[in-house]
A protein has these predicted regions:
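An acidic- and aromatic-residue-enriched active-site/binding cleft used to recognize and process polar
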Residues: 10-13, 73, 90, 129-132, ...
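Short, well-ordered alpha-helical segments in soluble proteins
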Residues: 26-30, 94, 118
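Walker A/P-loop NTP-binding motif
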Residues: 1
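Short, well-ordered alpha-helical packing segments
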Residues: 6-9, 16-23, 111, 115, ...
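A structural signal for short, well-ordered beta-strand segments and their strand-loop junctions
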Residues: 6-9, 69-70, 86, 125-128, ...
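Non-catalytic, compositionally simple segments
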Residues: 95-213
């Protein structure tokens, strides 16, 4: 409850939706059973004056110092210390990720806005489809700060504040099985939602784009 979290996505609307989803989880009965003392303001407070902040894009935990703020890609984080930075789908689609202008704007935003709000103990998570090799993850890899891992023990190895670990989950398993991804060769990642047959059909349409998955 004392952790200051920021979540970002390709636009403000989607980032705000993630924020509202979190609020619903925090107020749900299952969460309350585990964390009964973690509560949010009952009223939608637009500002911090006289109340704990709570609206569609930011909330504060009552009687604690933590909270969650959502921003669209390129949005401001000025004045906000960030303990945990979550970046989900910074590129809307294939076209955006293949735009040099968009890719450069994402890099500029990350290096000038996001990085400036982090501290020595901050943690970061980036999740998105790798539509282009020079996306944000690719640029970080070029800096030599990213190492791919395959075992659970590797997750808990100490990292420097500017180092990353990378976990890659293929839509259809093609690489060697690992502890983190023990699927057999040719096995789909989420068969109940995306069957192997539907994935192969997608691959037939455009192999290059499918390989991004």
């Amino acid at each position: 409850p004392d952790t200051k979290i920021a979540v970002a996505s390709y636009n403000f609307y989607f980032a705000s939706k993630l924020n509202r989803d979190v609020q619903r989880i925090l107020e749900g009965p299952n969460y309350k059973k585990i964390f009964p003392d973690t509560t949010l303001s009952r009223n939608n407070a637009v500002t911090r004056l006289g109340s704990y902040l709570r609206n569609g894009n930011e909330f504060e935990v009552v009687n604690q110092i933590g909270g969650l703020k959502s921003v669209g890609r390129g949005g401001a984080l000025t004045g906000n210390k960030v303990d945990v930075m979550l970046m989900d789908d910074l590129y809307k689609d294939y076209m955006e990720a293949n735009s040099p202008v968009v890719r450069e704007s994402v890099w500029d935003w990350y290096t000038t806005v996001v990085d400036s709000r982090l501290h020595n103990e901050s943690q970061q998570l980036i999740v998105f489809t790798r539509w282009h090799e020079e996306d944000l993850i690719g640029r970080l890899e070029q800096k030599g700060k990213v190492k791919e891992i395959h075992n659970f023990d590797d997750i808990y190895q100490p990292l420097k504040h500017d180092e990353w670990i990378k976990i890659n989950f293929e839509a259809i398993k093609q690489s060697e099985a690992t502890e983190l991804d023990p699927r057999a060769d040719g096995e789909p990642l989420w068969p109940n939602r995306h069957s192997k047959e539907s994935l192969l059909s997608t691959m037939e349409l455009d192999v290059e784009k499918f390989n991004c998955l």
